[in-house]
Swiss-Prot record:
Disulfide bonds join 178-202, 192-253, 244-257, 350-471, 382-392, 465-475, 545-556. It is found in: Virion membrane; Host cell membrane. Coiled coil: none annotated. It catalyses: Hydrolysis of alpha-(2->3)-, alpha-(2->6)-, alpha-(2->8)- glycosidic linkages of terminal sialic acid residues in oligosaccharides, glycoproteins, glycolipids, colominic acid and synthetic substrates. It is a single-pass type II membrane protein. InterPro entries: Hemagglutn-neuramid, Hemagglutn/HN, Sialidase_sf. Its EC number is 3.2.1.18. Attaches the virus to alpha-2,3-linked sialic acid-containing cell receptors and thereby initiating infection. Binding of HN protein to the receptor induces a conformational change that allows the F protein to trigger virion/cell membranes fusion. Binds to the glycan motifs sialyl Lewis (SLe) and GM2 ganglioside (GM2-glycan). Neuraminidase activity ensures the efficient spread of the virus by dissociating the mature virions from the neuraminic acid containing glycoproteins. Belongs to the paramyxoviruses hemagglutinin-neuraminidase family. This is Hemagglutinin-neuraminidase. GO terms for biological process: symbiont entry into host cell; virion attachment to host cell. The chain crosses the membrane at residues 35-55.
């Protein structure tokens, strides 16, 4: 780079042009500059101090002081108002979410108790339309359809000996008689029960009658509950009702059945679903029965069958379990053609290529036994305020969330909906789902299913679908064994192992024998209590638990189909036990 024409560098460290300044002069200049800077800083500091003093004087001035005091008072007043408003809001929130629901429930229980007290009768004078009100004993009202255990802690259980009480379920009265397919529903005010009375052994496609009863829970002198029957209806009108499901409704019972006089396999092979019947039986002896054709039935289903297990009355709607065969080229059949659900037991998985297992799981929905129809679960939903005009619809869950359709039960516990599905296909374990409905005023309602992973025991099955099989395959097997949840299920990690339920299982992997009462967690059985002798033949079981809130005792009624060597092939027996929880 070319040197600058304005500056040249000399050996004596001076710069040109301009006068030459020696080192001593430079030091003097630096000293003067520093003194000047310090002086400016000192003057600035003095000015700041003076201004602060003036500000203090102004603050101490009476006028400004009064203004500041007024502002402070207003701020304090506003703060007090805000605190008061927040307090009121907290009281409102607590009242709406805690106090009011408890008060309403208490008032409801008191009202039911008062009705039970004043609704009495004498021989000549009665102040009620019936002799005994349709109201459970007050000790049980608030312990029905509630989770017995609210926490997620670890508990131990013991099942007491069966309590001696009169059976509310009649048996067959001849060696050739047959009573089968019990369905039981316990509501807050009363209970409903039904079973099929088959006239020719247990061939339910021939001729049968339907037994229906309703009653209340009362306390015996021994201190434990008894199922007191108040009304009985025996439907003997020539209609062969099958697979009936029962539900408690206000002032009575609702029952969903289908009518058929042919084999179940023939129903699936057909193209038009059998007649669907909805029967309403009230405490004043009124019986109303209607043929229903729920939306979504015609053109989609070859057959539709009630789920046998009980339904529920929920949010002014009547909900029953159902299942059946879907026509392959129907709208529903095309929509669900590729849907399947393949649960896996992580403690005992099925080996093989995943794609192959998925294909086998899909094929399991189309068993050849049912003419290769897709066997699908569903829910019959009827608006209660339009029940006399039977405004019902079929709500169909996705097969990506459920296994092959089968018998089932809808449960309502602590305002939470659960669905039991019989393990009729290849999956051998108990099938229980949490469910939630989305109802619409117009258009199709929907339901979401959330599977609860249970691996504690298996049901008996035949052929390739025994209790030991865990791999997908097409079959129709298993048996109806519904459970009763004792605790709410939580999806939160780490606490699901303390989900408990009880029921009656059949302790065999291949044969319907050895009825056994149990309490179970998700992955292991906690208690086993065999009923009867080893090898006793049995079939369907349904379980309901409730609590005596007077002394906190927990009772469960296990209704079981047991073999009978005296009257008929089966005797339906309600086994009442006390469940101890520690």
């Amino acid at each position: 780079m070319e040197p600058s024409k304005l500056f040249t560098i000399s050996d004596n460290a001076t710069f040109a042009p301009g006068p030459v300044i020696n080192v001593a002069d430079k030091k003097t200049f630096r000293t003067c500059f520093r003194i000047l800077v310090l002086s400016v800083q000192a003057v600035t500091l003095i000015l700041v101090i003076v201004n602060l003093g003036e500000l203090v004087r102004m603050i101490n001035d009476q006028g400004l002081s009064n203004q500041l005091s007024s502002i402070t008072d207003k701020i304090r007043e506003s703060a007090n108002m805000i605190a008061s408003a927040v307090g009121v809001m907290n009281q409102v929130i607590h009242g709406v979410t805690v106090s009011l629901p408890l008060q309403i429930e208490g008032n409801q229980n008191q009202l039911l108790s008062t009705l039970a007290t004043i609704c009495t009768s004498k021989k000549q004078v009665s102040n009620c339309s019936t002799n005994i009100p349709l109201v459970n004993d007050l000790r049980f009202i608030n312990g029905i359809n509630k989770f017995i255990i609210e926490d997620y802690a670890t508990h131990d259980f013991s099942i007491g000996h069966p309590l001696n009480m009169p059976s509310f379920i009649p048996t067959a009265t001849s060696p050739n008689g047959c009573t089968r397919i019990p369905s039981f529903s316990l509501g807050k005010t009363h209970w409903c029960y039904t079973h099929n009375v088959i006239n020719a052994n247990c061939k339910d496609h021939t001729s049968s009658n339907q037994y229906v009863s309703m009653g209340i829970l009362v306390q015996t002198a021994s201190g434990y509950p008894m199922f007191k029957t108040l009304k009985i209806q025996y439907l003997s009108d020539g209609l062969n009702r099958k697979s009936c499901s029962i539900a408690t409704v206000p002032d009575g019972c609702a029952m969903y059945c289908y009518i058929s006089t042919q084999l179940e396999t023939d129903d699936y092979a057909g193209s038009s679903p059998p007649t669907q019947k909805l029967t309403l039986l009230f405490y004043n002896d009124t019986v109303t029965e209607r043929t229903i054709s729920p939306s979504g039935l015609e053109g989609n289903w070859a057959t539709l069958v009630p789920g046998v297990g009980s339904g529920i009355y929920f949010e002014n709607k009547l909900i029953f379990p159902a299942y059946g065969g879907v026509l392959p080229n129907s709208t529903l059949g095309v929509k669900s053609a590729r849907e399947f659900f393949r649960p896996v037991n992580p403690y005992n998985p099925c080996s093989g290529p995943q794609q192959d297992l998925d294909q086998r799981a899909l094929r399991s929905y189309f068993p050849s036994y049912f003419s290769n129809r897709r066997v699908q679960s569903a829910f019959l939903v009827c608006a209660w305020n339009q029940i006399l005009v039977t405004n019902c619809e079929l709500v169909v869950p996705s097969n990506n969330q459920t296994l092959m359709g089968a018998e089932g039960r809808v449960l309502l516990i602590n305002n939470r909906l659960l669905y039991y599905q019989r393990s009729t296909s290849w999956w051998p374990y108990e099938l229980l789902y949490e469910i939630s409905f989305t109802f619409t005023n117009s258009g199709q309602s929907s339901v979401n299913m959330s599977w609860i992973p249970i691996y504690s025991f298996t049901r008996p099955g035949s052929g390739n679908c025994s209790g030991e099989n865990v791999c997908p395959t097409a079959c129709v097997s298993g048996v109806y064994l519904d459970p009763w949840p004792l605790t709410p299920y939580s999806h939160q990690s780490g606490i699901n192992r303390n989900f408990y339920f009880t029921g009656a299982l059949l302790n065999s992997s291949t044969t319907r024998v050895n009825p056994t009462l149990y309490v179970s967690a998700l992955n292991n059985l906690k208690v086993l209590a065999p009923y009867g002798t080893q090898g006793l033949f049995a079939s369907y079981t349904t379980t309901t638990c409730f609590q005596d809130t007077g002394d906190a005792s927990v009772y469960c009624v296990y209704i079981m189909e047991l073999a009978s060597n005296i009257v008929g092939e089966f005797q339906i027996l309600p086994v009442l036990t006390r469940l101890t929880i520690t």
